């Protein structure tokens, strides 16, 4: 999965994060982070490296969902590349009931308008097709259609992208009241 995201310059993995839980007990409040600097998700020893982080005081602990962190590339209206940490996030769950994966986006470059509601067609055109292509390739790889996540204040998944916002006088909603920073 990460190879597809890398191919589209959406996620260059540099770390993995996960929590530990124990069946019948729940979350243990123990969080791990493993740097991939100098390593790779393709490393055959990686699963053992993750398991070796099991807390000593909890030999029955199991890993929860694994968050793949890193930077991705987005393009501005003039075509200039920008690297952005956590442009997209990939969460994979090794659950024995059935593995799952979730791809999340947290940037306005995927939508037709920025967070202030200003249309940005050149930015959308430079970025949204890459996300769409990656999602379609992930569906092919996994052999299962993606299920859209819950709608948020910032948008709603539609097909292999984001639903177009409602516009008034050609402007989308101003969402900056909820933007941190």
Question: PLM features: what roles do these ranges have?
Answer:
Residues 1-118, 124, 128, 149-152:
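Structured alpha/beta or helical-core interaction and ligand-binding surfaces enriched in interleaved
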């Amino acid at each position: 999965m990460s190879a597809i995201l890398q191919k589209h310059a959406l996620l260059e993995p540099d770390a993995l994060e996960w929590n530990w839980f124990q069946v019948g007990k729940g979350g243990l409040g123990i969080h791990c982070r493993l740097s991939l600097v100098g390593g790779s998700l393709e490393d055959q020893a990686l699963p053992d490296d993750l398991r070796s982080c099991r807390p000593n005081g909890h030999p029955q602990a199991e890993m929860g969902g694994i968050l793949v962190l890193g930077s991705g590339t987005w393009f501005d209206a003039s075509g200039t590349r920008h690297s952005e940490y956590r442009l997209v996030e990939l969460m994979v769950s090794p659950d024995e009931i059935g593995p799952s994966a979730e791809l999340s986006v947290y940037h306005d470059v995927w939508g037709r308008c920025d967070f202030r509601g200003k249309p940005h067609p050149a930015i959308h055109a430079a970025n949204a097709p890459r996300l769409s292509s990656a999602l379609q390739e992930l569906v092919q790889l996994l052999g299962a259609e993606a299920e859209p996540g819950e709608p948020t204040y910032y948008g709603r998944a539609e097909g292999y992208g984001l639903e177009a916002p409602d516009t008034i006088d050609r402007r989308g909603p101003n969402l900056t009241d909820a933007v941190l920073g």
